[in-house]
Amino acid sequence: SVIFKNYDNIDTIISLPKEHFKHIFKYLWGWIRLKQKRYDLVINTTGNSSSGKLSTKFANSKHKCFGDCNNDSVQNLKNKDHIHIAKCPVYALRNYLSKIGIDINKTKIPSLDIKLSNLEIAEGKKLLKELVYNDKKTICLFTYATGDKCYSETWWLELYEALTVKYTNYNIIEILPVENISKINFKAPTFYSKDIRQICSFIANTDIFVGADSGMMHLASASHTTTIGLFSITNTEVYQPYYNRNIGINTTNMNTNGIIEVIENVLSK
């Protein structure tokens, strides 16, 4: 997988097809490959996933962590953020290891990290320079999201206009989704790519990312650029970007001025 390209400790990825019955032989071969090896430790990183639980049971290992953050022992670790989808499996693993006599690691949970290389970051900088032609700091917008998570054009245009008034000393650019849709009617310079790592390297050279709850938001967080996630439907506490200055905003009780205040507070840190 391109996501784990620079992770030296990942050597084998078994990917089950989404449409099991259309690709039945590939699906069954995935399960056979899973069973062929014996593992020191098996971790289910998505506690609510039925296939995750099933594959954890199916795999050969003495030690299996099922990633359930709803049990009392995980909650008793007194980590108020244990419901976060990225932090939950880490807390669950720490809890499991403590049960088998291994001291719990109490360090801060690390950020998402796609591990961009220096070459990739340099390429991202070059792509940004081709778009803005100056040395100003850059605000990166992503105005799309799937389903009800997607804000209207009216909503985005109001925020965009407020940003252009407030941040005259910043570049404001927009990253486009694969669907090539802009909720601000292409008023800002746009960047389009289908290459996940190229997109991430581009974002890494901007100063702040603002976008709705989406895969692009998590990708921005993994680039280590300050990320502000906008939430109106999904649970902020479960999906918000975290670490450093990253923050999730519940927009159901905050207007455009409030969002600008949050952005200003983050940029001033």
Predicted segments with their positions:
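Catalytic machinery of carbohydrate-active enzymes
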Residues: 1-269
